[in-house]
């Protein structure tokens, strides 16, 4: 049996950690991770060869490493759940719900309406997305009968 050994690379490890925290749905995209880590390493080496300092070269490499990864659907869902549903949903459910919602077709159709660029979170469209996601999640909770906490009595409804 042949096994492949994963190459240890600073940029690969850095990207994998970032994806795990902000894009858990992408942590197994090995081709993407390898290519992006290689691009970042090349950018770093090129910057050093051009006379840039090591810290500046790392900044330049990080720009390559995280290109297209500044806006996270996962983080957006976490934000909506924490800000809008913290009192209604028991905490273990909040934590488990994000990856499930990320795969939900209704949630995906909301995200698909928007061009999610790196700077989308600072755009006026972000508020519309946030509001639509909130409404969609309310419907998902109602349709699926998810347990909610009555904020006045703190009991399961």
Residue ranges and their predicted role:
Residues 1-157:
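C-terminal alpha-helical interaction appendages
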């Amino acid at each position: 049996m042949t096994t492949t050994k994963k190459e240890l690379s600073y940029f690969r490890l850095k990207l994998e950690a970032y994806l795990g925290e902000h894009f858990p749905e992408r942590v197994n995209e090995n081709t993407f991770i390898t290519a992006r880590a290689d691009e970042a390493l090349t950018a770093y080496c090129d910057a050093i060869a051009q006379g840039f300092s090591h810290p500046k070269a790392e900044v330049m490499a990080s720009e390559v490493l995280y290109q297209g990864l500044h806006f996270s659907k996962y983080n957006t869902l976490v934000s909506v759940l924490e800000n809008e549903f913290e009192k209604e949903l028991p905490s273990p459910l909040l934590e488990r719900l994000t990856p499930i919602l990320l795969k939900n077709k209704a949630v995906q159709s909301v995200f698909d309406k928007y061009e999610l660029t790196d700077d989308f979170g600072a755009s006026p469209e972000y508020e519309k997305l946030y509001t639509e996601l909130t409404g969609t999640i309310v419907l998902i909770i109602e349709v699926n009968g998810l347990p909610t906490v009555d904020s006045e009595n703190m009991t399961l409804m």
